[in-house]
Structures are given as C-alpha cells and as structure tokens.
Amino acid sequence: MLSPKRTRFRKQHRGRMKGKSCRGNHICFGRYALQVLEPAWITARQIEAGRRAMTRYARRGGKIWVRIFPDKPVTIRPTETRMGSGKGSPEYWVAVVKPGRILYEMSGVSETVARAAISIAASKMPIRSQFLRLEI
C-alpha cells in the first residue's frame, strides 16, 4: 500500500474539494489513461486494487503508471468513545482527486486490451471516470 515515508504533521484538516484539477490532467507517460469525472478521496487500498487489476489483465505486456499518491491522513475515533479528548488517530491514507485528474496511464498494449484493463480498474474506484486515448 502507498503511504508517505514521513510527514511534517501527523494529522490534517479535512478540507474541501472545489473546482477542477489544474495539474495532472494531461497524459504524460503512456498512450491510454483513466480520467476522473467527479471529486473524491481515493484510498491507498483502492489505488492498489486498481493497479493490481490492470497488471493482472495486461499480464506481462504493457507498462502502467499510477499518477496519484495518497498523502492525506484520515483519522478515526475509536467506537463507543465519548466526544472530546482530541482528534482520533490516523487510520489510513487518501489521495484528494478533483475532476479531470488522471489516475492511471498505460502503454505497450493494444487499445482493446487497454480499454478492458482500464474499465476493470475503473470499476474498483468509488467515482465515475472515463477512458482517454493520446491524440497524436
């Protein structure tokens, strides 16, 4: 699972996701990509599940790039705990994703294989997304 080696602070505010993604919204490495259409938090487990699904489907052929990294800690309070006494402890990591952001890129395979692999990865995600092809 992806997570930062070290962070400056253990806990973060939740924040809010306004607007579209202004960075990471163009295909940079591969020929095909999965682009997000709505804002969400994507957990490290979901990123890993999508990556594994794509690599299994493509077998040895093709190369895959993961374009997001979970760098936001999500804290959870223990169950049946009274209110107060501070913020909960960090439980898992998420990547904050806005519309337009590229999640995965792929190359070295045919378009049909890439489309199928990316659709399997898209089904692992909690949000709507679309398949992109690099127009040359």
From Swiss-Prot:
<dbReference type="InterPro" id="IPR016180">
    <property type="entry name" value="Ribosomal_uL16_dom"/>
</dbReference>
<keyword id="KW-0687">Ribonucleoprotein</keyword>
<dbReference type="GO" id="GO:0032543">
    <property type="term" value="P:mitochondrial translation"/>
</dbReference>
<dbReference type="InterPro" id="IPR047873">
    <property type="entry name" value="Ribosomal_uL16"/>
</dbReference>
<dbReference type="GO" id="GO:0019843">
    <property type="term" value="F:rRNA binding"/>
</dbReference>
<dbReference type="GO" id="GO:0005762">
    <property type="term" value="C:mitochondrial large ribosomal subunit"/>
</dbReference>
<dbReference type="InterPro" id="IPR000114">
    <property type="entry name" value="Ribosomal_uL16_bact-type"/>
</dbReference>
<comment type="similarity">
    <text>Belongs to the universal ribosomal protein uL16 family.</text>
</comment>
<dbReference type="InterPro" id="IPR036920">
    <property type="entry name" value="Ribosomal_uL16_sf"/>
</dbReference>
<protein>
    <recommendedName>
        <fullName>Large ribosomal subunit protein uL16c</fullName>
    </recommendedName>
</protein>
<keyword id="KW-0934">Plastid</keyword>
<keyword id="KW-0150">Chloroplast</keyword>
<keyword id="KW-0689">Ribosomal protein</keyword>
<comment type="subunit">
    <text>Part of the 50S ribosomal subunit.</text>
</comment>
<dbReference type="GO" id="GO:0003735">
    <property type="term" value="F:structural constituent of ribosome"/>
</dbReference>
<dbReference type="Pfam" id="PF00252">
    <property type="entry name" value="Ribosomal_L16"/>
</dbReference>
<dbReference type="GO" id="GO:0009507">
    <property type="term" value="C:chloroplast"/>
</dbReference>
<dbReference type="InterPro" id="IPR020798">
    <property type="entry name" value="Ribosomal_uL16_CS"/>
</dbReference>
